[in-house]
Amino acid sequence: MHDIEILRPDLPRGHFRFVLFDFDGTLSLIREGWPQVMIPMMVDVLRQTGTGEDEVTLRAQVEEFVMRLNGKQTIYQMMQLGEEVKKRGGQALDPLVYKHRYHDLLMARIEGRIEALAAGQATPEDWTVPGSHALLKNLQSRGLTLYLASGTDLPFVRREAELLGLTVYFGAHIYGALDDYQNFSKKMVIERLLEDNKLRGEELLGFGDGFVEIEEVRRAGGVAVAVASDEANRRGVHAWKRARLIRAGADIVIGDYRQQGPLVDYLLTDSPLAGKQSSHG
């Protein structure tokens, strides 16, 4: 697999003023493994409806909607879970109940990582996609304004970004899920960003590992870099993520930011891409 895969060779380059980043899986690895928490929890909930479906079928169905909604606020995945319970004749709980159950299970998995970062026993580099800090520093030094928008609840995003030494790059432009979920979406952040800054679509660059942000950046006329990060191994491209993100409309696919220098040069100038790459017409 190539380090930088160009899927739209004629993409508009050199005009970017603002860059939008997703958080989990795009910059932060603190929540690495979240699907292994969410999917079994949901399969368990659906099994309790008394459905006749086997484990493999249930898991495939849950995985499909969980990953399709990845990038939106977590509550949407829980709302879909409620719909799936009803479809099977079960009594659905409030989506917030499911969300809190999931969050408790996830925290049991990741609280050691957060504590290690807070105590200085782990470094930000241990829990970020390789090359994240270098990329953000490079973009900021070239005068671009950076935004962070996450489907994770805002207080957690702020805390985890701070622990990872990322707040300095985004300042006040850190957005996350709100209790009143209808008042936040990545689409809303993008629309406000374009409107407030009188931006044309080609002046927006986006980085993300979720279907939603890739789709929304492209819809706005921006350029979408899909970060198909292999979060567990921290190297290379995750083939399943790559396939999904290409379907979402990715312009470029990378696995991490080890090649951020040539990538940024390519995006911000009209020079050809240096180094290892592949192009698809």
Residue ranges and their predicted role:
Residues 175, 251-259:
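Short acidic-hydrophobic, aromatic-tinged amphipathic segments that line or gate anion-handling sites
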Residues 96-97, 167-183:
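A short, structured active-site edge motif that brings together acidic residues
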Residues 64-141, 145:
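A metal-dependent, Asp-based hydrolase signature
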Residues 184-217:
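Conserved Lys-Pro-Asp/Glu-containing loop-to-beta segment of HAD-superfamily phosphomonoesterases
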Residues 1-21, 58, 63, 67-70, ...:
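Non-catalytic pre-domain segments flanking phosphatase-related domains
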